[in-house]
C-alpha cells in the first residue's frame, strides 16, 4: 500500500491536470510517480520543467540509461520497472543493453563512460574524484553535460 494517495488524473488538482495530460501524450501512460507528484502542482511543474530542460543535450537513451543505473544503485524496484518500460518503449533500448545499464555499463563506449560516472555519483553520494570527472570528459562530455549527468542521477533518486 502506498504511504500517500496516488490520485487518478481527475482526482489530481486542476492545476496539475494539464501536466499529467502532457506526460500521457508523450509516454502513452501516466506513471504513478507523476500522478503522486501531481498532488503538488508546483512540484509537478518543477519536475516536468527540469526533466524537459535536461532533454536538450543528453539524448533520451543516455538519460534512460542513467535512470536505470541509478535505480539499480538505489535498489528501487518501482524505478527499475518504470525505467525498463520507458527504456524499451521510449528510448528503444534492447534487453541486453538495459541489463548492462543496470550494472552501470553500456555496449556504446561513450554511453558506458556516462554510466560509469553516473553510478559513481550515485554510490558515492556525489563525492567523485578528479579522475572520475576526467574520464567522463575524455569520452567527449562537455562540462555542462557532466553537470547534467549529475542532475539526472539526482532526478532519479
Language-model features, listed with the residues they occupy:
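Hydrophobic alpha-helical segments
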Residues: 1-157
